[in-house]
UniProtKB/Swiss-Prot annotation:
GO biological process: 'de novo' pyrimidine nucleobase biosynthetic process; 'de novo' UMP biosynthetic process; pyrimidine ribonucleoside biosynthetic process
Residues in the signal sequence: none
Entry keyword Glycosyltransferase: yes
Known cofactor(s): Mg(2+)
Binding-site residues for orotate, renumbered to this chain: F34, F35, T128, R156
Chain residues that bind 5-phospho-alpha-D-ribose 1-diphosphate: 26, 72-73, 99-100, 103, 105, 124-132
Record-linked InterPro entries: OPRT, Or_phspho_trans_dom, PRibTrfase_dom, PRTase-like
Physiological role: Catalyzes the transfer of a ribosyl phosphate group from 5-phosphoribose 1-diphosphate to orotate, leading to the formation of orotidine monophosphate (OMP).
Gene from which this protein is expressed: pyrE
SUPFAM superfamilies: PRTase-like (SSF53271)
CDD domains: PRTases_typeI
GO molecular function list: magnesium ion binding; orotate phosphoribosyltransferase activity
Name this polypeptide is given: Orotate phosphoribosyltransferase
Length: 213
């Protein structure tokens, strides 16, 4: 685990974005941890979040021309990541996002920001069922652009309804790489460093044993 990944886990814990306990997911599964990126909700949070996304992007080595944030949660992520890339990595890249409702006045259309073209890096909070990615792919393809990759904050590394995860389905269906700031594996490595969190470690490992990929 790299220093920025450990720092991200501590940031998420401090903001109660990442919590341990017993939580019922939308799928009905009982999970020993929960991640709610919506709680990154202040200016400072967004500034830090952008730095972690930018760090993961640079670390990945993936090449891309533009950041795309799917409405709604992806919009502030794309914006703050673009700022962090410019400020901390000297990479001044364009970004854009979509509207859920097409505008019928002014410049019209359903895209805001730079023209959607070239190799697109899609940024979002998490991938649950992959629905937002599929909707975004339609927009990207309709504009003649290509998907360079997807970056999310956390990869839960667990099976969906089939034997593979929603992330693996996206990688298979769109022939692209999905990267994340942290994975479940990183979370377990972090818990292993904290003797006071042994109870949570056992629960998370048991969950991975049952649902992991």
């Amino acid at each position: 685990m790299k220093p920025y990944q450990r720092q991200f886990i501590e940031f998420a814990l401090g903001k109660q974005v990442l919590k341990f306990g017993e939580f019922t997911l939308k799928s009905g599964r009982k999970s020993p941890y929960f991640f709610n990126a919506g709680l990154f909700n202040t200016g400072r949070d967004l500034a830090l979040l952008g730095r972690f996304y930018a760090e993961a992007l640079v670390d990945s080595g993936l090449e891309f021309d533009l950041l795309f944030g799917p409405a709604y949660k992806g919009i502030p992520i794309a914006t703050t990541t673009a700022v962090a890339l410019a400020e901390h990595h000297d990479l001044d890249l364009p970004y854009c996002f979509n509207r859920k409702e097409a505008k019928d006045h002014g410049e019209g259309g359903n895209l805001v920001g730079s023209a959607l073209q070239g190799r697109v890096m899609l940024v979002d909070d998490v991938i649950t069922a992959g629905t937002a990615i599929r909707e975004s792919m339609e927009i990207i393809q309709a504009n003649g652009a290509t998907l360079a990759g997807v970056l999310i904050s956390l990869d839960r590394q667990e099976r969906g309804r089939s034997e593979i995860s929603a992330i693996q389905e996206v990688e298979r269906d769109y022939n692209c790489k999905v990267i994340s700031i942290i994975t479940l594996k990183d979370l377990i490595a972090y818990l292993e460093e904290k003797p006071e969190m042994a109870e949570h470690l056992a629960a998370v490992k048991a969950y991975r044993e049952e649902f992991g990929v």
